[in-house]
Amino acid sequence: MKTIITILGCGSSMGVPRADGFWGKCDPKNKKNYRTRCSLLITKGNNNVLIDTSPDLRLQLLSNKVKNISYVLYTHKHGDQTHGINDLRAFYINSKKKLNIFSNKETINYLYQNFTYLFKGAPDYPPILKKNIIKKKFSLGFQNEKINFKSIKIKHGKIFALGYVFKNIAYISDCSSVSEKNIKDLANLNTLIIDCLRFKVHYSHLNFDEVIKLVNILKPKKTILTNMHIDLDYEYLKKKAPKNICPGYDGMKIYA
């Protein structure tokens, strides 16, 4: 059974365009420059694994006609990865089953403290989520729809985020540097989906030149850029990057 990976959003924390309508260097005539905040969907049969609940989650799910969510993985606690969490209520209304969410202890604690009603319930609001601390290796789903994962601890500025490896694909949406251990975990990839914020250096994200250096070390067959700021026009970036590296876009699908 094939696995389908959908990039629901590939924009940086303010999206493209920003809320004030500013596109930066991105051509507004190119639909691939319209970027919602980072989120990913992995589909195998009826098993839908969502990575992160961006503030744009509702529109992302509607645009991609997503009718069910089986599990949710979180990369880290920042608002551009978590603040769409309330939209998960729709899937409890349909199934009447709590949704299992997974991440490291820091992220789970943040979600529980800030969205307590989703875990404990409130008047007229039943609890919809069940918290789980992530393991290094784990599987989600059943029988031929099961997906095997490996979680990787990745430096993201002052904190550590999680990257996920599955079916020789790695998803690392937020990253400032890669350790020797990370390099071993990311060996022999078919596809690397990687943070590439802008051309200038940033303390908590990789820039374009840093991504090129990393790709030359890891040597994945294909690299897709995500978490892109308004500096990075799709066509310009596509022409500038080597042939094995391309910018992602909202709605992009990868088949594995």
What do the predicted segments below correspond to?
Residues S95-L99, T107-I133:
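Active-site neighborhood of divalent metal-dependent phosphoester bond hydrolases
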Residues N46-S103, L189-T191:
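Active-site metal-binding motif and surrounding structural segment of the metallo-beta-lactamase
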Residues G11, K105-T107, M228-D231:
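Residues in the short beta-alpha loop(s) of Rossmann-like NAD(P)-binding domains
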Residues L99-E106, I224-T226:
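Short internal beta-strands
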